Each structure stands twice: as C-alpha cells, then as structure tokens.
Amino acid sequence: KFEPGTQFEYNSLNTYMLSAVLRKKTGMSLTEFLTPRLYEPLDIRSHHWETCPKGMEKGGWGLNLCIEDLAKIAQLYLNRGVWNGRRLLSEEWIDAATSPQIPTPNGEMRHGYGYQIWMSGGGAYQFNGAFGQYAVIFPQYDAVAIIYSGSTQLFAKTSLMQLLDSCFWACSDRELAPYPPGYDSLKAYLAKLVFSPEPERKGLGTDKIAFNKIRSLLDGREFRLFDNYGSLFPQPLQNVHGCYSKGADIIRFSSTEKGLAVTFYEQCERNTVYIDMDGGFTDSVFIMKEEQHLVSTRGIWSAGESEACITLFTSFLETPDTRIIELRILNESIEAVFDETPTAE
C-alpha cells in the first residue's frame, strides 16, 4: 500500500513479526528474553504470553498480567527506566518510545504513535489494549492509572477514559495553599474507609422444580443445528486468537449430580459447560484448536408445559469476554440464540 514509515496503519501482525525476529536473532523466546531483564527485576511472577503454532509468543497480543504487575511496568516508564535505583531502560529509549514516531490523523487517537505506545496529548501516553485495558502515564502529574475492564468499544476512548482525562487535566501545576479544615476532614474520611466483607455467593433464585423438569426432558437428548454460525467461543476471541469456528453443529444434554451438562460440537472440537441447579458458577476448560481457556458458567431457566428455555452465561476468565446463549426448546426442536459481551460495535 505504501512505503514503510510513510503512513500509519494499525497491524498487530507487525509486532508478531518482531517477536519472531527477536527469537531468530537471540535464540531465545520473548519470555526468556524478558525474564532477567524485566520480569525478575520488577518481581513479576505471574505472567503468560500465548504462543502461535510454531511456539513463538504472539507479540502483538496475548500477554496476560495481573493489574499490579502492569502498574509496575507503567511506573518503570514514569521513572524513566529506573526501578529501585537500578536502570533497566535507557532514558534515550524512554524518550523515543513515548514520543510520536508517526502521525495518526484518523480515528480517535490522533496524538501520534510511539513504540507500541499511543500518545494521549498534554505529555501523557498509554498502553492501550482491546476492550478497555489501559495503562496511562501522566508524567506531568507523577502518576499512572491502570484500568482493566470489559468495554464494548474496541480501542476507542471510552467514557471512563474521558472521565480519567478530565480529572487529571483539572489538576493545577501549583501547590495548594494549606487548608487544615479540609485536611482534617480528608483524614477523618479515609480513617472510616474499610473493605466490605466478601458477600456470600448465592444462586440466582432459580426454580429447582422447573430445573428438574427440564433435566428429565433433556437428559440424553441431542439436537442438530442447521444454518448456524454461532459458536461457544466469543467472536472477539476468535479474532484475537485467529481460531475461527464455523459454528456449533450439535448440542447434547446429559444429567449430572448437581445439574446438567451441555456439550457443544463444533467441527472437530467438543466442549462441555455445566449448569448448577442452585444457580451457581461451575468452572471448566474450553479448548479451541489446542488452545485452552478457563471458563465459568452459570444458567437461568424456565419451563412450561411443552417448552423450556435455558440461558447460559459462559465467562472466559482470563479475558473480559462472556458468551451468552439462549436455548429455546419446543417439543422436538431447539432454537439457539448467540450473544456476547463485550461486543465490537
């Protein structure tokens, strides 16, 4: 389309290629390269980077970090590459990475792009991930803000980000004059703050009589889906992982001690989720093209004389994504309606 470096077009595969180049040049995986240089100095112990079929980290996506550890990386940049008195990144690199290397005139992020970093304007910059994952660095206020969320907006500036911007841009560069009454009020307020006790996890108040009726109706039954393109795997995750499904072909039900197992057949894949009759969550492992994903499923249901309806909520625990499937069973037929949250709009 154009000569490299002359125009901007967002493309995560470019960063995947950088991961491949690093492996070729160093003989190390991206994780092996980063461990002594970044993870160990920052005491980042819980990390996982998804790999491609060739065993290379995907580079442009697929990094899983705790929110506290992402905050450490953001703080490292705020410290201009220094951590606990030790320099991990050169100041020259920090300056180059956090400065506009190419203009981004289109879209909502129009302040330019550095080295995998978006400029936010006013000297701020951010690591921006899909569906509301942010690390925003405000050097002029000596602050970082970390946000993990499940926004329906893919990369655009969300209302939460706009609120964050408005709070920081309202700050003054001048020191506040002493105001003892306000300070005393703040201390008293902070002293009263406590963590709420962990609430008891309860079911959804679902009807066990209706559930047992549905379970006896569906136990051992199998339904074939025609002209269906919906998958148990949410569409955003299909796009991110490059694991595309042609849709579920068959749904099979079987009774369990605590509820009902629902198995989805999709081409060569077979995945089972579980409904707890108490309305609670049940964990399982979802597999798509050899990649494993931890999921947790709950269900709600209703039953009539000759029909039943089950709604499944399957959350992919390592992501912000939840697949929602409504199954309407009438006599010998089934209708499956697929939805998800967040969804790219």
Per-region residue spans from a language model:
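Active-site-proximal alpha-helical segments within enzyme catalytic domains
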Residues: 14-21, 59-82, 133-150
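Non-transmembrane alpha-helical segments in soluble domains
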Residues: 19-23, 34-35, 39, 71-78, ...
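Active-site Gly/Thr loop motif
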Residues: 91-148, 154
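Residues that flank catalytic or metal-binding motifs in active/ligand-binding sites
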Residues: 59, 66, 93, 113, ...
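Structured C-terminal helix/loop/strand segments within mature extracytoplasmic catalytic/sensor domains
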Residues: 129-204
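Catalytic-site signature segments of enzymes, centered on catalytic residues
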Residues: 1-63
